[in-house]
Amino acid sequence: MSLKKRYRETIQPKLLKDLSLTNIHEVPKVMKVTINRGLGEAATNAKSLEASVKELAQITGQKVVVTRAKKAIAGFKIRQGMPIGCAVTLRGDRMYAFLERLINLALPRIRDFRGVSAKSFDGRGNYTLGVREQIIFPEISFDKIDAIRGMDITIVTTARSDEEGRALLSEMGMPFQSN
């Protein structure tokens, strides 16, 4: 059963009861997943940006947006408009497919994995996760990468509090650390 179908049929009714909500539309849901990769070396090394864009496109199955510097910072040796990273925003079916792959395939492949931190919520039910290496995703072949780079994954939910957000992600199967 896909994550989207499981959310509709089992997770939504369970959260409605557990969070003691009255309306099905009050139940928190995932709105979007944003994957971001900041590349400091992109200012000097154009190949690293190309490789990153290709990797994120492979992981997400969607076109990647190159992020550019808003203003010049001499200390970082960047000028306004220089490419400094890349990002992808996933919604709908691609979002659920990515979350399913992240939870069931990618996270368990992290070395010495003991669960993700439960403290990475922002106060409004959104969760951000930092991944140190892209090779945890099955789409990326270790032989074809030029360098190991990480990325930030932000899961934006309609939850009103961190507790609601955590309940939603726990039901979806996110492996939180037990402190």
Curated annotation (Swiss-Prot):
Pfam families: Ribosomal_L5 (PF00281), Ribosomal_L5_C (PF00673). GO terms for cellular component: ribonucleoprotein complex; ribosome. The keyword Secreted does not apply. It comes from the Bacteria. One of its GO terms (molecular function) is tRNA binding. Keywords: Ribonucleoprotein, Ribosomal protein, RNA-binding, rRNA-binding, tRNA-binding. PROSITE patterns: RIBOSOMAL_L5 (PS00358). GO terms for biological process: translation. Part of the 50S ribosomal subunit; part of the 5S rRNA/L5/L18/L25 subcomplex. Contacts the 5S rRNA and the P site tRNA. Forms a bridge to the 30S subunit in the 70S ribosome. Belongs to the universal ribosomal protein uL5 family. This is one of the proteins that bind and probably mediate the attachment of the 5S RNA into the large ribosomal subunit, where it forms part of the central protuberance. In the 70S ribosome it contacts protein S13 of the 30S subunit (bridge B1b), connecting the 2 subunits; this bridge is implicated in subunit movement. Contacts the P site tRNA; the 5S rRNA and some of its associated proteins might help stabilize positioning of ribosome-bound tRNAs. This is Large ribosomal subunit protein uL5. It comes from Synechococcus sp. (strain CC9902). The gene is rplE.
